Amino acid sequence: MYTLLSGLYKYMFQKDEYCILILGLDNAGKTTFLEQSKTRFNKNYKGMSLSKITTTVGLNIGTVDVGKARLMFWDLGGQEELQSLWDKYYAECHGVIYVIDSTDEERLSESKEAFEKVVSSEALDGVPILVLANKQDVETCLSIPDIKTAFSDCTCKIGRRDCLTQACSALTGKGVREGIEWMVKCVVRNVHRPPRQRDIT
């Protein structure tokens, strides 16, 4: 009887854990996106003041529960010298969120180069990628078609994995929930990367 009840409890309350990398150049808005995600999906999370967010040196970690999935976010620093550390996390991850500052046209080619390295990595084969064109609340930002055109060289390297380019404003929260919900659907159905662990709450 205990085994039956224990199994039922696990079935009803377990969370499948998925590791999601948040990548992109410095000042693209990765940490702001992470904070907005935690605020939108964790009822009791107060969150830090978005005006106090500074450039990430190293790693920020956050957790969000969406249905039966638990997303463990790893927000990695985007400075050039830190990008060499990104691939150390690839084997463990189930999905990638790549954040682009759509107001910074001068660094767009630099962002594309970094993205190209990400999608070219064999360690990320089949891993879904959400490309967020961030800062869409700014009038002078590049549009989604502009971003897609600038990154068109990378299309063939994306392969058969799930990939979505979406407008977002991490500051206002627009597009945050939609992006996370899309990622959850992708990681849950990706049989090539099963959940990292079972976590019972």
From Swiss-Prot:
Lineage top rank: taxon: Eukaryota
InterPro entries listed in its UniProt record: P-loop_NTPase (IPR027417), Small_GTP-bd (IPR005225), Small_GTPase_ARF (IPR024156), Small_GTPase_ARF/SAR (IPR006689)
Binding site for GTP: 24-31, 75-79, 134-137
Record Pfam families: Arf
Acetylation in keyword set: yes
Sites bearing N-acetylmethionine, chain numbering: M1
Annotated GO CC locations: cytosol; Golgi apparatus; membrane; trans-Golgi network
Protein name according to UniProt: ADP-ribosylation factor-related protein 1
Biological classification of the source: Eukaryota, Metazoa, Chordata, Craniata, Vertebrata
Gene: Arfrp1
